[in-house]
Amino acid sequence: MSIPNLSSVTQLLSIATGLVSTNNPVVVPVVTQILSVVSQLLSGTPASVVLPILQGLIPLLTNFPLILIQLLSVIAGLQGLPVPSSFSPDYKV
C-alpha cells in the first residue's frame, strides 16, 4: 500500500517545521492549517479539495519567501504541474 501525494505530505511537514523554527507566534495558524492539510491528504482526500486551503496561505507567507517558494512547489505538484528545479524545496538562495 502506498500513500498518495507522499512527496507533498513530506514537503508540507518540512514547511511546518521551518515555520515553527522561526519561533514567531504569527505562524501558528498557518502551521495549524498545514497540519490539517497533511491529515486530509493522508486520509485520502483529493488534492483538489486541499488546494484552496494551501492557496489561501500564500498571502500569509509573504514575509517568509523561502517557505513561500516551497509552498508554491507543493501547490504546483498537487496540480500535476512540473516544478522547475529553482522552485524545488531543496533550492538554496
Curated annotation (Swiss-Prot):
Q: Which UniProt keywords apply?
A: Glycoprotein, Signal
Q: Give glycosylation sites per the record.
A: N5
Domain of life of the native organism: Viruses
Does the record carry Glycoprotein as a key word?
A: yes
Is Signal one of the keywords?
yes
What is this organism's lineage? Viruses, Varidnaviria, Bamfordvirae, Nucleocytoviricota, Megaviricetes
Signal peptide stretch:
1-22
> What protein name applies here?
Uncharacterized protein 368R
